[in-house]
UniProtKB/Swiss-Prot annotation:
Keywords: Nucleotide-binding. CDD domains: YajQ_like (cd11740). It comes from the Bacteria. This is Nucleotide-binding protein Pnec_0318. GO terms for molecular function: nucleotide binding.
Amino acid sequence: MPSFDVVCEPDMIELKNAIEQSNKEITNRFDFKGSDSRVEQKDEALILFGDDDFKLGQVRDVLINKMAKRNVDVRYLKDDKTETISGDKRKQTMKIQKGITSELAKKVVRIIKDSKIKVQASIQGDAVRVTGGKRDDLQETMALLKKEVTEAPLGFNNFRD
């Protein structure tokens, strides 16, 4: 039986490239000369550094623009906390969302069941497995989920025939 998994994971290679491009632009921009502004990746989080709130906002804008150019959805990032380091310097932590939350998984299953498409959905850890009799039904389900679920970026992998 054909099946696929609904997941919520960013392309980590593209995200890393976006971070590197952001840091390169920040070091080359005139308004950041002499500044200690940068973006770092630590495990499942991004840490943005800026000399003040304005520069921190500029660093965030540069990162979001670079992510958009590399087709990495900005909804993968969740604002965590902003803290003052030393003096006026600011640091903001942004968590990278990986995996589907249980509420979102339940919503995906409910959308699939309410659609009356002849497929079955089951929650498996941080993914939702969708199985069906025909490939066309699975493709219809993918289109439905892309249209209906807007609060989180969904991806589809493990497409088996």
